[in-house]
Regions:
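Transmembrane alpha-helices and adjacent helix-loop boundaries
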Residues: 1-305
Length: 305
């Protein structure tokens, strides 16, 4: 209940921010945080709750961005373009999920990374290097609708994952993560639950890619397929607390703000610093900021008793 109340207050605070300030730098920072929440939460469903450590998340992000951008620039209503992008990402997810789920462990991760790279190279060879929005749309560009769209998307991703994980289906997904053979023996269809987690995950990240394409004035199709998006999702989820609802939210806040600070102070070293931070988190705080906060609370409680 406390987490729900905290989430509502946080979302309300972000929703009220444009009423307090019109500074574009703060609103753009908010958009980056919301996109990071959605990106990490969509990966968290498949990688954290279903236990399928995919390294191909960027493929679905890129497909959502590409389809949405093409349709929206072509004159389609934004909501239809976003829905089409998510639908294409989901369809591609099912297409590669059926053969990919035959692989286990590291082989699954490497296989999804290889498929994502094949798609990235293909798009780079077939699509133009850059896409800019039409002059009429550029003249009327406004950060506010992008801000509220990405905020709504972040809230939607958190809510969908929370509802799914808390349902009977979510119990089956987690059972498959813990022991696939035991889950099968108990009557839980492992492939069915993994495919369902994949479909929801790819739909959410497809919407996220579409929102990214709508947000940017200049859009590089191949950039949206970069493996950096996958590793950002992993890093945010693990820093915050993988396999938890609020972990990706905490991770996104920390990651985006800290990244902005590092990009100014140590522009050439921020990637190295995050790499070292990721290793330290995995080694000493595998539960991320969520675990660190729990440890701190227990320590404070012991000292006050």
């Amino acid at each position: 209940m406390k987490l729900l109340l905290g989430g509502i207050l946080l979302a309300a605070g972000f929703a009220a921010l444009p009423l307090v300030t019109q500074r574009n730098d703060l609103l753009n920072l908010g958009v980056q945080i919301f996109l990071a929440v959605a990106l990490a939460q969509s990966w968290n469903l498949l990688g954290g709750y279903a236990g399928q450590i995919t390294l191909g998340h960027a493929a679905f992000f890129g497909l959502g961005a590409l389809v949405t951008r093409m349709l929206w620039v072509g004159g389609a209503p934004l909501y239809l373009a976003l829905a089409a992008g998510a639908l294409v990402a989901t369809a591609f997810g099912v297409l590669i999920g059926l053969p990919a789920f035959r692989l286990r462990g590291a082989y699954f991760s490497i296989g999804t990374l290889a498929l994502a790279e094949i798609l990235r190279i293909t798009v780079g060879n077939l699509m133009p290097e850059i896409s800019t929005i039409p002059a009429a749309a550029l003249a009327s560009y406004n950060i506010l609708p992008r801000y509220y769209l990405t905020l709504l998307l972040a809230v939607l991703c958190v809510a969908v994952v929370a509802l799914l994980v808390g349902s009977r289906v979510g119990l089956g997904i987690r059972a498959v993560r813990e022991d696939e053979a035991a889950a099968e023996a108990s009557g839980v269809g492992a492939l069915k639950h993994k495919l369902l987690a994949l479909m929801v995950s790819t739909a959410l990240v497809g919407f996220t890619g579409g929102a990214f394409a709508y947000y940017h004035v200049s859009y590089y199709p191949q950039h949206a397929f970069s493996p950096a998006w996958t590793f950002d999702a992993l890093l945010i989820a693990f820093i915050g607390g993988v396999g938890t609802i609020h972990g990706p939210v905490l991770g996104a806040l920390f990651y985006v703000i800290f990244k902005e600070v590092l990009a100014v102070q140590w522009v050439d070293l921020h990637l190295l610093i995050f790499g070292v931070l990721f290793i330290l988190v995995v080694l000493f705080f595998p539960g991320g900021l969520v675990e660190a906060w729990s440890r701190a609370r227990r320590l404070i409680t012991r000292r006050t008793v």
